[in-house]
């Protein structure tokens, strides 16, 4: 381990600031605080370190016989079959590749993408704001559906209104998530009061189980609803929810020149366009 004395560190920092031509840190009694220029430089440094780490991982993968190692991030409310179908398509193109899959909120995933910890992020674009360092592409738009368990009292009714939906407790996605924002906007536009909810959850699996064990209601995108309806887990209710959601993918500018990333992007496009479904193996 190498130790650096404070005078030597101060001298090095001064030389770095002279080289950059801008102050990078503010000096305080309790230490240093990055300036706006310092924050920017730290961001670049983190991305460089992440890229070096990813390069080491790819080299190690190649030594073990793998051709590529890619890292994908996806949000919990994304279509459950889209990313897995894209991964299968990518592995057909690169049989020896390794794929890492992370699930989190879009804000967290986009930060990791910018820092070089992820190669691609797939998620809802409803609240997405463009970022200078990222490219983005819309994959599809879809409607939102109100869902319940099979056999729910509302499933036998040919048509529903807001009053009927307010009569039951709800499972809500957390405030700030794209799907929750869409629902809140829909309620506002319809002049409706907030829906009563008992549970606020960002876990798709937990939400499905909660629906199975109760008469609570929730909301899902059309593709998610279709996917789990085919497996007998939920039923979309006969209610037209005036909400349209979007799903897309993001990647760092310039990385599409890498053949592995280019093939990963094409695999997402293929899976999105072909609506790949997995068989029910129950």
PLM regions: where:
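Central regulatory/effector-binding core of bacterial HTH transcription factors
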Residues: 67-128, 193, 201
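A short LG(V/I)-centered, amphipathic sequence patch enriched
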Residues: 15-34
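A late-sequence structural motif
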Residues: 82, 235-278
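Beta-alpha-beta core module
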Residues: 130-138, 142, 205-254
């Amino acid at each position: 381990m190498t130790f650096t004395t404070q005078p030597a560190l101060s001298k090095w920092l001064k030389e770095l600031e002279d080289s950059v031509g801008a102050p990078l840190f503010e000096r305080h009694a309790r230490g240093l605080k990055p300036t706006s220029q310092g924050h920017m430089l730290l961001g670049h440094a983190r991305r460089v370190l992440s890229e070096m780490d990813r390069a080491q991982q790819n080299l190690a993968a190649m030594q073990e016989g793998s051709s590529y190692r890619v890292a994908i991030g996806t949000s919990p409310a994304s279509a459950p079959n889209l990313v897995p179908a894209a991964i299968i398509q990518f592995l057909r193109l690169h049989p020896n590749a390794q794929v890492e899959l992370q699930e989190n909120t879009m804000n967290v995933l986009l930060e990791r993408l910018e820092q070089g910890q992820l190669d691609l992020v797939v998620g809802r674009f409803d609240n997405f704001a463009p970022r200078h360092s990222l490219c983005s592409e819309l994959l599809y738009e879809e409607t939102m559906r109100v869902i319940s368990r099979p056999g729910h009292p509302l499933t036998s009714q040919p048509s529903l209104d807001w009053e009927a939906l307010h009569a039951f407790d709800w499972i809500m996605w957390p405030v700030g998530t794209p799907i929750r924002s869409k629902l809140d906007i829909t309620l506002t536009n319809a002049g409706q009061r907030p829906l009563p909810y008992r549970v606020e959850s960002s876990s798709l699996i937990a939400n499905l189980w909660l629906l199975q064990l109760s008469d609570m209601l929730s909301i899902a995108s059309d593709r998610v609803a279709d996917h789990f309806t085919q497996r007998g887990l939920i039923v979309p209710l006969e209610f037209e929810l005036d909400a349209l959601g979007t799903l897309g993918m993001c990647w760092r500018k310039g990385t599409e020149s890498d053949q592995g990333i280019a093939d990963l992007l094409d695999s997402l496009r293929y899976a999105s366009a072909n609506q790949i479904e997995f068989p029910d193996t129950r």
